UniProtKB/Swiss-Prot annotation:
Pathway given in the UniProt record: Cofactor biosynthesis; coenzyme A biosynthesis
One example GO MF annotation: GTP binding
Matches recorded under PANTHER family: GTP-DEPENDENT DEPHOSPHO-COA KINASE (PTHR40732:SF1), UPF0218 PROTEIN TK1697 (PTHR40732)
Residues noted as binding GTP in the record, renumbered to the chain: D35, I36, V37, D54, K56, E109, D132
Catalysed reaction equations from the record: 3'-dephospho-CoA + GTP = GDP + CoA + H(+)
Protein name: GTP-dependent dephospho-CoA kinase
Top enzyme class: transferase
This protein's record includes keyword Nucleotide-binding: yes
Family named by the database record: Belongs to the GTP-dependent DPCK family.
Entry keyword set: Coenzyme A biosynthesis, GTP-binding, Kinase, Nucleotide-binding, Transferase
Organism: Methanocaldococcus jannaschii (strain ATCC 43067 / DSM 2661 / JAL-1 / JCM 10045 / NBRC 100440) (Methanococcus jannaschii)
Claim: Nucleotide-binding is one of the keywords in the record: yes
Amino acid sequence: MLVLPEELREKLKKPFGKVYKTLPDIDGDIVTVGDIVTKTAIENNIIPKLSIFDLKTRRNIPVKINHVFKKVIKVKNPPGCISDEAIESIKYLSTINDRNIALLVDGEEDLLALIVIKYFPIGTYVLYGQPDEGIVVLKINKKLKQEIEEILKQFKKI
C-alpha cells in the first residue's frame, strides 16, 4: 500500500492539465476517474475503456450512474492511499483490449489517476474532475509518465 505524504497533498490538489467546463471532443481511449466525470462522459455517449468511481462525490454525497457496464471489478482503496489491490487491478486492466469496464472503489478513487497514468499506454486520455472548476483532460505521454513516477516515489510504502 502507498500512503500519500502530507507534503504532497497541496501539489496533487492542483490540476495536472487543462481544465474544461464541458467535455471536449476526444479521439482515443479514455479512462475516467471520479463519479461526476464518469457520469458526464456516459451522459454524453462517451463510453470509457475504464471508469473508476466510488458512487460518492465530495466524499459522501451519493451519485447514481445510470449505465450497464460490461464488467464491474470491486476494490478497496482507503482515503489518502493507493492499495496494492487497486494497483494490480489497474495494471491488469491496462493490458486488455476490453472497454466499458468499471472499477468500483470501496473508499476513495482520487489518487488512482496516478496509477492509470503509470500503467496505461501512451496516447490514452485520462479525465478526472477538478472540484468547482471542471474536467481535467490529460493525454498520457512519456513526460507525464516520468512526472507521475517521481511523485509516486515520494509516497510512503507500508
